[in-house]
């Protein structure tokens, strides 16, 4: 596949998450996708990824991710994204705070046969927890 076709797959991935239409993932994510940044306690593969999304949706029901950059080379696509949402449900064991968060992250996707088969992801988890008031900002004790 061309790099433009691979980028289109990642755009559909983001669309599936932003529109909460996770059925779209069945067409573009391999059932046995390897996630190098999975969250402990969730099963591996595509179904585990859907469960992680549902956890975020229940914590940030108005959450929206936007793609800021897409860079592709060979069978890999790098996405820089921004997530915005209001914490109106429990998140990682903490009760809802009602606070709005804006956080950024980077994902790397490897694509084979028209499907995402591997994923690496990093996001500003510390900044998110600070915005939620769950971890103090430096100098605030």
Q: Regions from the language model: what does each represent?
A:
Residues 1-141:
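C-terminal and inter-domain tail/linker signature
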């Amino acid at each position: 596949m061309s790099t433009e076709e691979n980028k289109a797959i990642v755009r559909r991935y983001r669309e599936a998450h932003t529109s909460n239409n996770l059925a779209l993932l069945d067409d573009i994510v391999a059932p046995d996708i390897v996630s190098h940044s999975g969250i402990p306690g969730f099963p591996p593969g595509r179904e585990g990824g859907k469960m992680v999304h549902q956890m975020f949706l229940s914590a940030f029901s108005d959450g929206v991710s936007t793609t800021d950059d897409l860079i592709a080379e060979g069978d890999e696509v790098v996405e820089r994204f921004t997530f915005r949402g209001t914490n109106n449900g429990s998140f990682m064991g903490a009760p809802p705070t009602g606070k709005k968060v804006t956080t950024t992250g980077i994902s790397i996707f490897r694509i084979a046969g028209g499907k995402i088969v591997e994923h690496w992801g990093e996001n500003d988890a510390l900044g998110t927890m600070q915005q939620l008031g769950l971890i103090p900002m430096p100098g605030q004790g």
